């Protein structure tokens, strides 16, 4: 993350946009699980940040401030659209087994992410995908670091349970299918 600094209206904001756009987009996309919605929400993040630039106080890096705006917009979007349990269909072209395994792992993790509330998903995304520390996540989300730690722990537990249940049902399904075929 960049260090805290004042936001100069035109030039610095353009530089900030260029520097932080991809990071903000990735964070939002990982929360909403929809690239088109993430694109719109990222644009809205920068519009709102530009309009509120006079209220920004440089106590934290501008990137953290932008992510906070973006994550809040993503959570609001999920609430409005009731998309918290929606996983977009993904088609992967897998030329070899390793690519197939990675695609399958992305699907499993993506499905497990849909079992999380938007607040838990935001904590997981910022920690594991963006590599932020608990303190940095706390600054982005506006909550204590202890709350971030408990959200991450709760999210990991839910995801483990979800993935475990899916693997058990796959095993049961393949065993029963084999029994039906006389195997």
Whereabouts are the PLM-identified features?
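Structural recognition of an alpha-helix C-terminal capping motif at a helix-to-coil junction
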Residues: 40-47, 60-72
């Amino acid at each position: 993350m960049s260090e805290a600094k004042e936001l100069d209206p035109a030039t610095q904001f353009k530089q900030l946009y260029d520097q932080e756009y991809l990071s903000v987009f990735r964070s939002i996309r990982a929360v909403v699980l929809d690239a088109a919605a993430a694109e719109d929400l990222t644009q809205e993040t920068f519009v709102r940040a530009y309009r509120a630039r006079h209220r920004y106080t440089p106590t934290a890096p501008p990137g953290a401030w932008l992510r906070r705006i973006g994550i809040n917009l993503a959570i609001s979007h999920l609430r409005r659209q009731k998309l918290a349990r929606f996983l977009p269909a993904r088609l992967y072209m897998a030329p070899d087994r390793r690519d197939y395994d990675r695609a399958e792992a992305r699907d499993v993790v993506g499905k497990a992410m849909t079992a999380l509330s938007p607040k838990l998903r935001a904590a997981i995304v910022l920690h594991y995908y963006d590599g932020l520390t608990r303190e940095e996540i706390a600054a982005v989300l506006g909550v204590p670091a202890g709350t971030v730690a408990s959200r991450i722990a709760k999210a990991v537990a839910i995801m483990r349970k979800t993935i475990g249940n899916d693997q058990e049902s796959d095993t049961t399904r393949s065993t029963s299918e084999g029994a039906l075929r006389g195997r």
